[in-house]
Amino acid sequence: IPPLAEVSVAFTYFYKSPHDFRLYILLDLSKLSEDYTEIKPYDSNPIVGSSAYKHKAGTHLAAILRNPAAYEPIPPRAVGNRRRIVFGELAGKTGAAYLMSLLGLEKDDIGAKAVASGLKNLRMGDLIEIPLEDRLEKKIIEDK
């Protein structure tokens, strides 16, 4: 059985279907299905998986903000999902600078390197996950 989320998105975006699929309810529909069946979808599932629009911070995040379509051909809001950014041991200097900015700290090269090194030395993987709402996205872009 083909997955509903992928098929409906393909019909809408790639085949320009004249049908009015309500893609914005796909994530809610997936969660409802999970509640009834007690079958959790894989985190890596496209469209509705918990990692579908999750991005590690750093240069990857900078690229997402410059040109989201390069990494996300289907916008997260269109399918009821949202973009999330993750800070942790892979953040790097750029990611650390973004984190400092979001926390209201003055970001400089030395501070960003120190934060990146501290995150890496903790060796705890992903430490902070933040839903990237419009307000935060604008702040990151303005603070470049």
Question: Language model features by range: what are they?
Answer:
Residues 1-23:
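C-terminal helical cap(s) of enzyme catalytic domains, especially alpha/beta-barrels
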Residues 18-144:
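A mid-to-C-terminal "edge-of-domain" accessory segment
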